[in-house]
């Protein structure tokens, strides 16, 4: 079939006329409220970054504590560290947590752990260790702010601390040097477990809040130009 230039322009004019008279279709809103997705993704990424950062900090700090704390197979019992928030939870219990409780537990845990880490920073004997701890505390404060942002986006209030309950990593005079090191060891170990759990928490939340993919695409092709 021979389509001449005039015929092509005529067909194009006809197509434009048809499109002009089609009922208006609202455009997809690409600039509106993105919802909680970006905040959740940012928080997830931050937990993974902190996991990486903690590996470096823990290696430095455990070497500072010395043997047996820097030995790979050392796994002492929890003694004075019972006040630390526990990340370990039964799998079925973890799955049954609603979004608000999941976020609240993360926020409260890191609020406590941050106070303990600041206590470690004050007690650190070397300038290099104090710098490493201060940098990690700043990153952990950023994670707290990110969790608060997710909660605000979802309409959840921040948990309010009870008066006079702010934790402090400051044992009494009867605490021996070895037991103090045990507490420090368990603080780092519990923090590692919390970051691992938080990555699972926010990955689960991210998948739950992910919007469905668009299923309709308008595709126009022009030929003959």
From Swiss-Prot:
| Family matches, as Gene3D superfamilies | 1.20.1250.10
| GO BP: any one term | positive regulation of astrocyte differentiation
GO molecular function (one) = ciliary neurotrophic factor receptor binding
Keywords, alphabetical: Cytokine, Glycoprotein, Secreted, Signal
Keyword match Endoplasmic reticulum: no
SUPFAM superfamilies the UniProt entry points to: 4-helical cytokines
Q: What is its main location?
A: secreted
Which residues are reported to be glycosylated? 29
GO cellular component terms attached to this protein's record: CNTFR-CLCF1 complex; CRLF-CLCF1 complex; extracellular region; extracellular space
Q: How does it assemble?
A: Forms a heteromeric complex with cardiotrophin-like cytokine CRLF1/CLF-1; the CRLF1-CLCF1 complex is a ligand for the ciliary neurotrophic factor receptor/CNTFR. The CRLF1-CLCF1 heterodimer binds SORL1 (via N-terminal ectodomain); within this complex, the interaction is mediated predominantly by the CRLF1 moiety. The tripartite signaling complex formed by CRLF1, CLCF1 and CNTFR also binds SORL1.
Function, as annotated, reads:
In complex with CRLF1, forms a heterodimeric neurotropic cytokine that plays a crucial role during neuronal development. Also stimulates B-cells. Binds to and activates the ILST/gp130 receptor.
What is the similarity comment for this entry?
Answer: Belongs to the IL-6 superfamily.
Q: What is this protein called?
A: Cardiotrophin-like cytokine factor 1
Q: Which gene does this sequence derive from?
A: Clcf1
């Amino acid at each position: 079939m021979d389509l001449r230039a005039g015929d092509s322009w005529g067909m194009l004019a006809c197509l434009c006329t048809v499109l002009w008279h089609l009922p208006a279709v609202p455009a997809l809103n690409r600039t509106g409220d993105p919802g909680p997705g970006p905040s959740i993704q940012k928080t997830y990424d931050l937990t993974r970054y902190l996991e990486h950062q903690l590996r470096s900090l823990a290696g430095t700090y455990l070497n500072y504590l010395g043997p047996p704390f820097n030995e790979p197979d050392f796994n002492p019992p929890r003694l004075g560290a019972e006040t630390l928030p526990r990340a370990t939870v039964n799998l079925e219990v973890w799955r049954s947590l609603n979004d608000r409780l999941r976020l609240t537990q993360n926020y409260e845990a890191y609020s406590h752990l941050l106070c303990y880490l600041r206590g470690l920073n004050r007690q650190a004997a070397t300038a290099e260790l104090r710098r490493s701890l201060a940098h990690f505390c700043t990153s952990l404060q950023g994670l707290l702010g990110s969790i608060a942002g997710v909660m605000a986006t979802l309409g959840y209030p921040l948990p309010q601390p009870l008066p006079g309950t702010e934790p402090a990593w400051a044992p009494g005079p009867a605490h021996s040097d070895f037991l103090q090191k045990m507490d420090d060891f368990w603080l780092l170990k519990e923090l590692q477990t919390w970051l691992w759990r938080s990555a699972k928490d926010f990955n689960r939340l991210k998948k739950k809040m992910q919007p469905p993919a668009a299923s309709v695409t308008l595709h126009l092709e022009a030929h003959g130009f």
